[in-house]
Amino acid sequence: EDFSGQAIMVSHSRDEIYRFAEEVIMLQEGKVIGQGETKEVFRQPKNRQAAILTGCKNIANAKKLGEHSIFIEDWGLELTMEREIPDKLSAIGYRAHDFVPLCSGEEENAVPVKLLSKAELPFEQNFYFQPEKGEGEICFLVQRDGPYGKMQEIPKALQLREEKLLLLTEEN
């Protein structure tokens, strides 16, 4: 409170950065890969490495199909969206707490999955799935006191909400 100047804080703790820094600059091998207001950079990182640094657990290769559609190659899923897709799209990011668990894979923008493993923790459950039509792993984290904390069944699909989808490019 008594200090009126600016300071540079170097940290490897994303929680510390989010809590204390109004603005952030992310570096990788001496190059800036993300910068701006901290909350905005965490909300919408622009590229794969920045998404990883902000804690995004689900990053998958993707390509633009049209002005409003993409194909998530790693998950075998085509999505149609209202927003325009950037030409240089290379991947998507999706935060592990943001999925909507479904009992069937028939819903729009849902990836059918099969359970690989599950971890019970004091305050959350961690689910690790494999997409039925793709490769890789999808992490879904459920807070015990959250909206899905009392889930009775293992989800058969995970729905992606457009407003939560991170469209990542290789450029900053």
Please describe what each predicted stretch is.
Residues E37, Q49, K63, P112-K114:
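Residues located in well-ordered beta-strands
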Residues E23, Q35:
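Short, glycine/charged-rich "phosphate-handling" switch motifs in NTP-dependent
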Residues E29-G30:
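Conserved ABC ATPase "signature" C-loop
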Residues K39-R43, A51:
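Short acidic-hydrophobic catalytic motif
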Residues S4-V10:
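Conserved H-loop
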Residues I17-R19:
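A short, surface-exposed alpha-helical micro-motif characterized by mixed small hydrophobic
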Residues S13:
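Two-component His->Asp phosphorelay active-site signatures
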Residues K57, H68-N172:
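Non-catalytic connector elements of ABC transporters
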